[in-house]
Amino acid sequence: MIKYIRNFSIIAHIDHGKSTLSDRLIQTCGGLNEREMTSQVLDSMELERERGITIKSQNVTLNYKSKSGQPYQLNLIDTPGHVDFSYEVSRSLAACEGALLIVDVTQGVEAQTVANYRIAKEMNLKIIVALNKIDLSTADPNRASQEIKNIIGIDVNNAIQCSAKTGYGIPELLECLIHDIPHPQGDPCAPLQALIIDSWFNQYLGVVSLICIKNGKLYKGDVLKSMNTGQKYTVDQIGIFTPKQVKREILDCGEVGWLVCANKNIIKTPVGDTFTLSTHPAKKACHGFKKLQPYVYAGLFPIGSKNQKIFRDALYKLSLNDSSLFYEPERSEFLGLGFRCGFLGLLHLDIIQERLRREYSLDLLVTAPMVVYEILTIDNRIIYVDSPSKLLSLTKIKEIREPVVLCNILLPKKYLGEIISLCIKKRGTQIDIIYHSTQVTLTYELPMSEIILNFFDQIKSASHGYASFEYKFSRFQRSNIVCIEILINKKRIDALTVITHQEQSIYHGRLLVNKLQKLIPRQQFDIVIQATIGKRIISRGIVKQLRKNVLAKCHGGDITRKKKLLYNQKEGKKRMKQIGNVNLPHTVFLAVFDVNNNKK
């Protein structure tokens, strides 16, 4: 019955114990036996276990018998805590009626704690606070409770103290979940409405979709229709995760489960769409969720032309599992065919690159990451560019606008000076400052290009690891942006072009030329490296040629003989420079990435 179903997510800042708590809930409810239990059960990717972070939201259906003896079905969705994967949180919460907000009592409230709370509050979810890691000697539940009250504004009198590691407080937490979180409000007799929360590619089953039954019931063999595209699909298999993949004949109203269709072209149905029955369709779609636009773009080029098809197919499959991943074909004069890909941040880029390497054995060259710029032309047209080549191809530019983010930084008071200095260095504008008992919330407007690269590391370094931040796109702002092009022996290398602010261009150009001087191997002729903005050369360097000692066998004798040998060598080097090709190793392209990370 629907009144005994509870759908909830676990939300928290990174490293506050979400995945460990999920493990303990699964173990307590008997989802897996002792032999099958491993740490981070729901972190199915090897990459997630290695890094100790949750990348993809995961779902598990648990059977729990309350203290009164009434059986309940709990649908738990574990979510990521890193700012780059906040879109996964909003997608997961769309299927829930409640959220479990975890706060590490050794760390207190951090930026993503506040951000995730706001997302849940906007969706009108019932929020239960759990104070985790209560077993540690450094635990300070009173301080954590005070911070929750002061910074977030939640009454913490009913907060549950627990330890996901030892299991302390887990029974009380489960009882609180079933009593405080409301059951799904759907109608089992209404026309089917199934919200697609996620999808991924399985090499045996094809495309698997994670769905939440908002209204009606879903049976194996039903013919579904997408309310977005109108396409029809036949249900081949349905089931739930316990966390094992268990097949079922029916998914009832309020349940969260998986779906496999006989039609393989389900790929065209986007995450956030609604399925309904083709014979008895619903009148309107479920309220979905807005697909986030990528913040960071980079060119990905496979090493070796034979890998082109594998690379295209790999991106196709990964985009099913990750709806925020954008890609389109791109051609570079120097690197050949590849794809221009969009990401939510540098960690997202790093994860995708690592998955392509591990899951598809692809070695890739990655060009310098950049943000999207808004271009206003003389005839008042708005154009968005995500690559240096697109910006260079435009003429009649009236102004270039860069994206600006609203950044909230939560930090201890004693590090306030260092963090403000860092924000000023990053061209930031202070919007607000709020003092709490021991912490401060700083609100700054910062250019997104300054945030995406190494701001996270710098803010952690300036605060000795205690500061945390979250950000969201605010607007586009007029800015003095320039393209730095790299010429090697007067030949433009498009893959090394970078976009930067005018103030940093000279420093950036010199740094890039110096890096390239060290990385390009010496050859039989001089290699001239130039960094240019338009027709102006802002930096120049030379990789000196290798020279054979042609005078080694001349012991004394007429000086004209020596001059002739040196002249012939000089002329030979000239001819070689005209027809010779400069071989650039792969490390050269990594230098551009490194230069971006070394911005002032």
Swiss-Prot record:
Keywords: Cell inner membrane, Cell membrane, GTP-binding, Hydrolase, Membrane, Nucleotide-binding, Protein biosynthesis. One of its GO terms (biological process) is positive regulation of translation. GO terms for cellular component: plasma membrane. It comes from the Bacteria. It catalyses: GTP + H2O = GDP + phosphate + H(+). Its EC number is 3.6.5.n1. It is a peripheral membrane protein. It is found in: Cell inner membrane. Belongs to the TRAFAC class translation factor GTPase superfamily. Classic translation factor GTPase family. LepA subfamily. This is Elongation factor 4. It comes from Blochmanniella pennsylvanica (strain BPEN). The gene is lepA.
